[in-house]
A protein has these predicted regions:
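Bacterial N-terminal signal peptides
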Residues: 5-15
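Hydrophobic small-molecule pocket/channel-lining residues, especially in calycin-type beta-barrels
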Residues: 19-177
Length: 177
């Protein structure tokens, strides 16, 4: 159940493809601009979890990172072991100019996930953790289809080839004030 709590805001806020390496001297965030803004999210997951919330992607720290902040709404339902007050942050950054983007996820339960970031197409962002680390491998996918952002937080256990969705979500972009 703690893993569900780990994943909920990750999906509320908030895949394997070739790494997108931005040419040196270009805007590293150009391929991810479709993520920017505040998005509504209705998430469903294993063990009967249903949650509503929002997440915002925006550049911060002088345009050096792309940050995702999430909030849970009042409509969270799940088993007693599920943390409806979960909080997390996702930071996307370019470690070395001209190299693929990286991301790091933190939450209030002490989980940390490091991701490689790629953009298989103009409306898809794929966050993939290192499969050589102990434990499950994680995949976070954002896809913009029309005016709806959808996504999945998935896990693959060591020795397995199939990804299992832990949470899935979708929602529209909120109008800017």
């Amino acid at each position: 159940m703690k893993m569900m709590a780990l994943a909920l805001p990750l999906l509320l806020t908030l895949p394997v493809a070739a790494q997108s390496v931005p040419p040196s001297g270009t805007d590293p965030w150009k391929a991810l601009t479709f993520l920017e803004g505040t998005w509504e999210a209705k998430a469903t997951g294993s063990a009967g979890v249903v949650a509503m919330g929002t997440y915002t992607f925006r550049t911060e720290l002088g345009n050096h990172i792309l940050a995702r902040h999430s909030t849970n709404g009042a409509g969270c339902k799940g088993p007693a072991t599920f943390d409806c007050d979960h909080g997390d942050l996702l930071y996307v950054f370019q470690d070395v100019p001209g190299q693929p983007l990286k991301a790091v996820y933190f939450d209030n339960e002490g989980h940390v996930i490091h991701y490689d970031v790629s953009t298989p197409d103009a409306t898809t962002a794929l966050f993939l953790s290192d499969s050589s680390q102990p434990g499950p491998q994680f995949r976070l996918l954002y896809e913009l289809k029309g005016a709806t952002m959808s996504g999945k937080f998935q896990m693959r256990m060591p020795g397995q080839s199939d990804w299992k969705s832990y949470l899935e979500w979708s929602g529209a972009k909120r109008p800017q004030n």
